[in-house]
């Protein structure tokens, strides 16, 4: 069965992470819109291959969906998958921190649900030539949008040793960042890096075997760091979560799945800030402008069940947070 599945196109094998749980969390936002006589509108801010969007469109026949992705290949695959719902979808090639501009272009004033499934997609991991995976040799690219921007090869071949230490330590949380950066600089002096295999070989040579046994593949953290740097993932996320909050209608919900602590920290910070009163400490009365915008729906982060991980092993590291808007938008 596994071999047969592996032979199928990625789009056919794709199982959306925590699909039912995400949709159940978003559903009350759509119902709030209906009660006001409005047609519910959702944004899938990280469309990928459209699995979550397809499930939402199937479950909610009145839903209009805006799908956003920076990956043109993913956008094309999702477009084919969502063709039966083409009269209820707008698919946009954009980065998800551009929510405000996307909605402005579409003439959509606000939305009732936003889903963000962060990190690298199944398509990007499975398409070898994209260079996201360390398990096989491929061009050292790692761009989510292959039409623009620097590649991972540009980073490893051109960044100074200090810059490499900084990003590998900060974005990869790699304790051997110094050794790895030094090895990269020495190796590229002889021959510039062109493939993932060449990079993995050099990383293996300096990461102790004992550390690899306890911490997973020795290149895992460095590849994460390079991917984040190439795609400016955390900078985008820092802009995207506030943009999502600003675009969400009263009673609407935002659901975010993150896959490592750096992502979750950003999401948590924005959600917590929006869920607290802004009244000065000791202020006798909470004025309307001081009331929180958001209500936390999940208790901290929710994690996958054993059944959800069995359905999709890539869900294992997922961390889910959800909030609801409980205060009118400033421009509403």
Curated annotation (Swiss-Prot):
Superkingdom to which the source organism belongs: Bacteria
NCBIfam families according to UniProt: 16S rRNA (cytosine(1402)-N(4))-methyltransferase RsmH (TIGR00006)
Catalytic activity entry: cytidine(1402) in 16S rRNA + S-adenosyl-L-methionine = N(4)-methylcytidine(1402) in 16S rRNA + S-adenosyl-L-homocysteine + H(+)
Entry protein name: Ribosomal RNA small subunit methyltransferase H
Any single GO CC term annotated in Swiss-Prot or TrEMBL for this entry: cytoplasm
Keywords: Cytoplasm, Methyltransferase, rRNA processing, S-adenosyl-L-methionine, Transferase
Top enzyme category: transferase
Residues binding S-adenosyl-L-methionine, per UniProt: 50-52, 69, 103, 117, 124
Originating organism: Paenarthrobacter aurescens (strain TC1)
Gene3D superfamilies per the UniProt record, alphabetical: Putative methyltransferase TM0872, insert domain (1.10.150.170), Vaccinia Virus protein VP39 (3.40.50.150)
Function: Specifically methylates the N4 position of cytidine in position 1402 (C1402) of 16S rRNA.
Subcellular location: Cytoplasm
Enzyme nomenclature, EC number: 2.1.1.199
GO BP term, example: rRNA base methylation
């Amino acid at each position: 069965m596994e071999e047969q599945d592996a032979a199928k196109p990625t789009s056919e094998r794709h199982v959306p992470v925590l699909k039912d749980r995400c949709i159940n969390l978003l559903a009350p936002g759509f119902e709030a819109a209906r009660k006001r006589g409005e047609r519910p509108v959702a944004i899938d801010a990280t469309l990928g291959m459209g699995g979550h969007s397809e499930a939402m469109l199937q479950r909610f026949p009145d839903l209009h969906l805006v799908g956003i992705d920076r990956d043109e290949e993913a956008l094309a695959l999702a477009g084919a998958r969502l063709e039966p719902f083409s009269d209820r979808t707008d698919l946009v090639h954009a980065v998800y921190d551009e929510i405000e501009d996307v909605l402005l272009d579409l003439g959509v004033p606000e939305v009732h649900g936003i889903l963000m499934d962060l990190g690298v997609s199944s398509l990007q991991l499975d398409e070898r030539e994209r260079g996201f995976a360390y398990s096989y040799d491929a061009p050292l690219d790692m761009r989510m949008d292959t039409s623009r921007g620097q590649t991972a090869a540009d980073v490893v071949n051109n960044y100074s040793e200090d810059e490499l230490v900084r990003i590998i330590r900060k974005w990869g949380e790699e304790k051997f960042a110094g050794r790895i950066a030094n090895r990269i600089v020495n190796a590229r002096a002889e021959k510039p890096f062109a493939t993932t295999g060449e990079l993995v070989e050099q990383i293996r040579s300096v990461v102790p075997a004992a550390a690899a046994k306890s911490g997973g593949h020795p290149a895992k953290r460095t590849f994460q760091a390079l991917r984040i740097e190439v795609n400016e993932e955390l900078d985008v996320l820092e802009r995207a979560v506030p943009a999502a909050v600003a675009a969400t209608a009263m009673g609407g919900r935002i659901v975010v799945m993150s896959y490592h602590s750096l992502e979750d920290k950003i999401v948590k910070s924005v959600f917590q800030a929006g869920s607290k009163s802004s009244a000065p400490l000791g202020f006798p009365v909470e004025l309307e402008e001081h009331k929180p915008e958001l209500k936390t729906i999940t208790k901290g982060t929710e994690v996958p069940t054993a059944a959800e991980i069995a359905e999709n092993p890539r869900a294992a590291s997922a961390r889910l947070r959800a909030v609801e808007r409980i205060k009118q938008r400033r421009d509403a």
